[in-house]
Amino acid sequence: MKKYWIPLTMLWFVLVAASPEPQWTLHTVQPGETLSKIVRLYLPYTAAYTKKELVNSIKSINGIDENLSPGQTIRVPVVWDAPLKPKTVPKAKNYMAKGVYMNPSSAGTRTILDTGYKLRLRGANTVVFDAKDDMGAITYPSNLKAKYFPNEDYTPNIEELPKMIDYLHHMGVHVVARMVVLKDPIMAKINPEWCINREKNWLNPADPNVQEYLLAVVRELSDSGVDEIQLDYIRYFADTKTATGMDGVSRSDTIAGLLKKIHDITAPKGVLLSMDMFGIVIWQRDVDVLVVGQDISKLKPYVDIISPMLYPSHFSKGFSGIKNPADDPYLFVYDGIKRMKDLVGDEVVIRPWLQAFPLHVTKGFGPGYIETQIKAALDAGATGWLLWSPENRYNYSFEAMQNVMNYKPETKVASLGGKGTPQKVSNKPNETDVIEQQPVPATTNGVNPPHVDLQPTVPPEAKQSSLPPLRPVANSKPFFRSIP
């Protein structure tokens, strides 16, 4: 274990020694200016992740409180002369993404950075954050607000999307923007005529206005620097109906057409496109396809990755003769992936969502439960995996990740047509790299090792800002904590 940690420690010392001195700019308080207004002006040019962090840092550096006087000069710890402009890190669609979901609250704080760091130590590499959530809210400062929801009064959870992406990229984290597509309470309230089911806040995917809005969000995200856009709820509401309002056009045709338009935006920019899918849809029963419109044969040309939601707890009791599917995680994950691979062949990568929450589990939920699902996914031929905990409780998950770092998938034979645990047939090596095999240090004296990339590089094409010139202050200390 020590042999992996020593090179990392040496690398950190080298980079820290080469880091530039902290930089500051002097700001003269104007009449009517508050500390909050000043922070909003400078936040993109500092290493602070949130406005609250920067407020506290300015107060500490200058020995002041919230009260400011016109003409007063304060130091602001500016480290860049232009806002960050992260770029997408293009990857092949069979990139072995292994990671977790982060809700808007976590993404709006250093929790997401701390999680990215913990993932990298345990051989994982991916964070999925909500860019457009289940309530229809865009979770970052968007340029679309003025046109589409000018009167909506809400504060985005993520104050600095470019900074979040840049910091995660510097950790080697694959950044995925989750976009809830057709379930949208905000737009349903503003434009009820856009809905196909107003009671359920479900937008009509065939409506040109709906498509225009959704494509605008996709364009904005594609230009933000994220590495992948993941579409959720890109389907009709499960209402037992099959009509679209257009003669000769099925629900599956409509969903496939919308997906194609989205793919036409993401593909030229090197942004991967993935979509979530009900676990039950994998069985492709006619009634499910006709109602929700997710016909895999029509969708697969326009998506790079499909993430079936194979949560054992979401299968009804007695499904395929299994008394409580939540207590048989290996069988449902393994068989679901096998069925999906039979449907899409090699055209689309399968990367499942796995259950990292205890719903309906009666036989001991813990690290072993999550580890079992990961092994089932890899044994079935999945390319990576994602863990879902709505509350982002991942302590069990981190332990499971540690346990499967060097796992070699096993080829097995299983089918939910029968019962029993799949039997091992043969072994095959798994896909992993040197970085992902680095173990967690046995001890760090109670302190996480500092992250090495404290000051991401400003892109060369960034324009000069109109802020005052930077003025390094001698013998000053950087306010910015290590990432995370």
Where are these regions (language model features)?
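Primarily a LysM-type cell-wall glycan-binding module
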Residues: 19-47
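Glycine-rich, aromatic-flanked loop segments that form ligand/cofactor-binding clefts
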Residues: 52, 126-128, 157-195, 230
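Active-site-adjacent "subsite" loops/lids of carbohydrate-active enzymes
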Residues: 88-107, 165-166, 177-224
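Catalytic domains of carbohydrate-active enzymes, especially glycoside hydrolases
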Residues: 113-137, 223-228, 302-305, 380-384
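Aromatic-lined carbohydrate-binding/catalytic grooves of carbohydrate-active enzymes
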Residues: 122-156, 238-245, 401
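Active-site groove signature of glycoside hydrolases
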Residues: 128-130, 204-206, 213-247
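Glycoside hydrolase catalytic-domain groove-lining segments
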Residues: 249-277, 282-285, 291-359
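Substrate-binding cleft of secreted/luminal carbohydrate-active enzymes
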Residues: 303-315, 329-330, 339, 346-417, ...
